[in-house]
Swiss-Prot record:
SUPFAM superfamilies: MIR domain. Ubiquitously expressed with highest expression in liver and kidney. The keyword Transmembrane does not apply. Residues 21-75, 83-138, 139-193 form the MIR domain. CDD domains: beta-trefoil_MIR_SDF2_meta. It is found in: Secreted. This is Stromal cell-derived factor 2. Residues 1-18 form the signal peptide. One of its GO terms (cellular component) is protein folding chaperone complex. Its main location: secreted. It comes from Mus musculus. GO terms for biological process: chaperone cofactor-dependent protein refolding.
Length: 211
């Protein structure tokens, strides 16, 4: 009976809720904008010259850069089915499309600000538990027009940009790092990309949560 009710609600969601309930889902490939500094989360096959020596993660102003796409996945050692809405408080991984490495953090110092280093780690989408980030947002689900924070699940820092700028060979790109303190520097928003639609049943659950 409960399943039938959800399926019936699915039709209502399609008619009423589709325009204002654009949830972000597993399997989506997106660019993430830091709303304070207007840069998109970016990576490339350039390694840090200090700290971990892993692949660097930066912020770029370019809207068109192909190195700014990230796939949203379930946390380490789990599978999040494509089209599953991301809940506020849910741990996820963000996998860099062009290099196959995951957004990662650990107790190394970032090169410019002295905060916690954020890197890209792993091979072909598989790294370790330090790739997990918890989505912090208002309401039951991460929605496309809403701002979110990403809290590193193991060290509790927030994915942040505070404006420090690199020189060569990545001139003009901003440092991305982890900070313990919540501030306007920690807010991100899903922008361009390919957003996987929820299944009918999952869309029904989203609508039911909003009633």
């Amino acid at each position: 009976m409960a399943v039938l009710s959800l399926l019936l609600l699915g039709g209502l969601w399609s008619a009423v809720g589709a325009s204002n309930m654009a949830v972000v889902t597993c399997g989506s490939v997106v660019k993430l904008l830091n709303t304070r500094h207007n840069v998109r989360l970016h990576s490339h096959d350039v390694r840090y010259g200090s700290g971990s020596g892993q692949q660097s993660v930066t912020g770029v102003t370019s809207v068109d850069d192909s190195n700014s796409y990230w796939r949203i996945r379930g946390k380490t050692a789990t599978v999040c089915e494509r089209g599953t809405p991301i809940k506020c408080g849910q741990p996820i991984r963000l996998t860099h499309i062009n290099t196959g490495r995951n957004l990662h953090s650990h107790h190394f110092t970032s090169p410019l600000s002295g905060n916690q280093e954020v890197s890209a780690f792993g091979e072909e989408g598989e790294g370790d538990y330090l790739d997990d980030w918890t989505v912090l947002c208002n309401g039951p689900y991460w929605v496309r027009d809403g701002e979110v924070r990403f809290k590193h699940s193991s060290t509790d820092v927030l994915l942040s940009v505070t404006g420090e700028q690199y020189g060569r060979p990545i001139s003009g790109q901003k440092e991305v790092h982890g900070m313990a303190q919540p501030s306007q520097n920690n807010y991100w928003k899903a922008m361009e990309g390919i957003f996987m639609k929820p299944s009918e049943l999952l869309r029904a659950e989203v609508h039911h949560a909003e009633l």
